[in-house]
Amino acid sequence: MERDEYQLPNSHGKNTFLSRIFGLQSDEVNPSLNSQEMSNFPLPDIERGSSLLHSTNDSREDVDENDLRVPESDQGTSTEEEDEVDEEQVQAYAPQISDGLNGDHQLNSVTSKENVLETEKSNLERLVEGSTDDSVPKVGQLSSEEEEDNEFINNDGFDDDTPLFQKSKIHEFSSKKSNTIEDGKRPLFFRHIYQNNRPQRDTQKLFTSSNAIHHDKDKSANNGPRNINGNQKHGTKYFGSATQPRFTGSPLNNTNRFTKLFPLRKPNLLSNISVLNNTPEDRINTLSVKERALWKWANVENLDIFLQDVYNYYLGNGFYCIILEKILNICTLLFVVFVSTYMGHCVDYSKLPTSHRVSDIIIDKCYSNSITGFTKFFLWMFYFFVILKIVQLYFDVQKLSELQNFYKYLLNISDDELQTLPWQNVIQQLMYLKDQNAMTANVVEVKAKNRIDAHDVANRIMRRENYLIALYNSDILNLSLPIPLFRTNVLTKTLEWNINLCVMGFVFNESGFIKQSILKPSQREFTREELQKRFMLAGFLNIILAPFLVTYFVLLYFFRYFNEYKTSPGSIGARQYTPIAEWKFREYNELYHIFKKRISLSTTLANKYVDQFPKEKTNLFLKFVSFICGSFVAILAFLTVFDPENFLNFEITSDRSVIFYITILGAIWSVSRNTITQEYHVFDPEETLKELYEYTHYLPKEWEGRYHKEEIKLEFCKLYNLRIVILLRELTSLMITPFVLWFSLPSSAGRIVDFFRENSEYVDGLGYVCKYAMFNMKNIDGEDTHSMDEDSLTKKIAVNGSHTLNSKRRSKFTAEDHSDKDLANNKMLQSYVYFMDDYSNSENLTGKYQLPAKKGYPNNEGDSFLNNKYSWRKQFQPGQKPELFRIGKHALGPGHNISPAIYSTRNPGKNWDNNNNGDDIKNGTNNATAKNDDNNGNNDHEYVLTESFLDSGAFPNHDVIDHNKMLNSNYNGNGILNKGGVLGLVKEYYKKSDVGR
């Protein structure tokens, strides 16, 4: 019988079931199976019905290795339905396989092949007709339980760091049901066959059009519109895995509001794309641009990397913006290196005083004569690095071109729209594209693509970032040094980059999944030692690179910020958030553009909170410094008037002329004067911090009731520090980071390994992700958040937290318990609420640079975030009460109420000074009068408060001062007449005057 007799068209020789049993044409049967061959399981084809027959292969070498694709994320354990089908298949084939193998051991006999093929055909027809299971066989990164059960099949020489998704999944059939065949009763070879070989079904076509049978059947079974999470409008399930209940009752159900605000055409794929099914990879250049983009989409091998590229393209505002940014970054690097090299080796500074032209001080052939040895070697190294960057740019252009075609032809989004288009619309277009063409060439990707929704997309894009958020919030990293000034944990960008390289590069493999060795408790000591070695190696490399990095960044910061500080000296007091603050403020699954906008909006409130606290000691010192510097500048400027040509070049000290000192002292004077606080601010730090919390999402329980304390302000300033201090720390970090990597971080290696193992949660279709990013916590009062709708969960957060939710479902959530577990759980719940608000609130459907049109954001540049606009004219104009100009509503609450005896609306005239009558008007003074607003028909009165208010009963504890005596020059401020006359006044003036200011 010919082997091709049973081969179906479009199968491409992918059927490997029969070849694994009968295709071993050698006399010696090898009981070990090719593990990589197990990763290629085609989909069941429902539309082909009972015509599912499979071709056999002469040997395992006949399988095209190029067509075998690494499973990206279908890393789950089998569901119950798949287990039932697998067991039926094993039981159906067991007699035939046993007869064929235990008889004459003729594995290559034609009769045995025909019998088993006929039995396989009948059983497959029965399974297809009686089963509607279209799930994909689970291939990929195994869960930890499956790893322990299947360790017997792994080769001893297999690399421990090989990711789980690259290993073949050995399906277990032990003790799941009573009728399962016991593997222990069979030889190892039979167990291999029973556990690994299933009847292979006809492979799905590479592409399916929008009107394909499978798609129509799926649409009929799941009839109804879909929302942004890829779920139906009724009976919606939002988050979770395929085997877990998801959040229900969410306002994400609103389907049409996205297309109403930003109308986009749904992806319209080609009507006839059957030609693409047989197009190999080496001939995709013959396809049109749209067909090639569709071919790339169908051949996605790693959905994590693909979605990260899609998001980075959106974040970079399209093809031309990204390319321009990369080119300008290379130009910046070239400029810094060449300018610094030229100024250091090609200029003869000794000729500057006597020369009048640039050509007089330039050294000829400086690159060949002046630059030698060590410097020239590193210049050549720099040239080589620039060449690598240019080559990388070439490949980036090709990759970005493919992404541009994907956006343009498949998502119907142009580059011009990316700057104003919300990310939610991009997800919506991805879901439409998935609905039209969910099938791919890589069959194990089908289930992953069927899980495309807002939550899963965020988990894939931020798989690493979610772990980093939890890592930095857990405070398990030791970043201090046992030397003065460095005993506290200070995170800098340099140290953050090294941690990301050492930790994340060690925990995750090249495909973006956690390595097997990290998840196994038995390999904890091995991974801990390897991570320690990695830290120490990174520290050694940083020591070697430190001199060059310090030189480069000093020049870069000098060129970037010198002119800013020169033209705007007040900007030296500008503040920004530290790197550790950004990680503490960021929520799980919060994409970078959302976080960046939120943090940028918080700076106004953060400055207001810091500026509320007086800085009298600093002001006094700066006033003295500005006075001294200003005095010297004035003297030098005055002397310059008499002889401007000669005096400007007059040397006050060795090689330091008058111009030098005028420049230096003038800069110091300008900085000190602009740093002095001269404005008046309303002091209400509690209300300001609560408003600031709406943007930072950070308000520790320890701060409660102490918002007005100086120590709380200092603690906040550690997170919101001066920019000049942060820059100095970055430069210092270039020299300190090697020692932190060598001495401090290795002690945290064990806790880091435990952190990843304990905080990793397996999700079917996603793989291992940070458990807090799944928003699934069952240990809060024994309730499962997946079974709660958003309103119920929001109310629960409001009860547990110390703050209340506002109308936009924003929770002000702080922990009641100070344990690390409760703090982590509280942050997870908080992240869930804000995630729902970002994706379900139509007001947040804005681009990366736009503000939502809602209350709380300034409409104009002059508008303030707070209701505390301070104006002396407004606050103290006649008829106003200064007490009403507090930020909070509690200004006139308990403890702040104005005495009824003072502000009596019934008869206000009784409370004023009875000594002042109408005659005072003649004397040039005005009484406080009360005007009753009869038109309003209420008891509200408008008071006109003038100078006589000081003489009234508004201050009952003070002695009543005769107003006429105040006009007398012999009257002092204490109610006592000066006995000394004019001399007494002069003495009193010098006693209380502010001469030093």
UniProtKB/Swiss-Prot annotation:
Chain ranges on the Cytoplasmic side, renumbered to this chain: 1-318, 398-538, 560-620, 678-723, 745-997
Region (Disordered): 29-88, 127-159, 214-234
UniProt topological domain (Lumenal) ranges: 340-376, 642-656
Catalytic activity: a 1,2-diacyl-sn-glycero-3-phosphocholine(in) = a 1,2-diacyl-sn-glycero-3-phosphocholine(out); a 1,2-diacyl-sn-glycero-3-phospho-L-serine(in) = a 1,2-diacyl-sn-glycero-3-phospho-L-serine(out); a 1,2-diacyl-sn-glycero-3-phosphoethanolamine(in) = a 1,2-diacyl-sn-glycero-3-phosphoethanolamine(out); a 1,2-diacyl-sn-glycero-3-phospho-(1D-myo-inositol-3-phosphate)(in) = a 1,2-diacyl-sn-glycero-3-phospho-(1D-myo-inositol-3-phosphate)(out)
Key words, A-Z: Autophagy, Cytoplasmic vesicle, Endoplasmic reticulum, Golgi apparatus, Isopeptide bond, Lipid transport, Membrane, Mitochondrion, Phosphoprotein, Transmembrane, Transmembrane helix, Transport, Ubl conjugation
PTM annotation: Phosphorylated by ATG1; phosphorylation is required for autophagy and cytoplasm to vacuole transport (Cvt) vesicle formation. Phosphorylation by ATG1 regulates ATG18 interaction and preautophagosome elongation. Phosphorylation at Ser-122 is required for selective autophagy by regulating anterograde trafficking and interaction with ATG23 and ATG27. Phosphorylation at Ser-122 prevents ubiquitination by the SCF(MET30) complex.
GO cellular component terms, semicolon-separated: autophagosome; cytoplasmic vesicle membrane; endoplasmic reticulum membrane; Golgi membrane; mitochondrial membrane; phagophore assembly site membrane
Family as reported in the entry's similarity comment: Belongs to the ATG9 family.
Subunit relationships: Homotrimer; forms a homotrimer with a central pore that forms a path between the two membrane leaflets. Interacts with ATG23 and ATG27 to form a cycling complex for trafficking to the PAS. Interacts (via N-terminus) with ATG11, required for recruitment of ATG9 to the PAS for the Cvt pathway during nutrient-rich conditions. Interacts (via N-terminus) with ATG17; required for recruitment to the PAS during autophagy and starved conditions. Interacts with ATG2 and ATG18; required for the retrieval of ATG9 from the PAS to the cytoplasmic pool. Interacts with ATG41.
Name this polypeptide is given: Autophagy-related protein 9
Protein's organism: Saccharomyces cerevisiae (strain YJM789)
Gene designation: ATG9
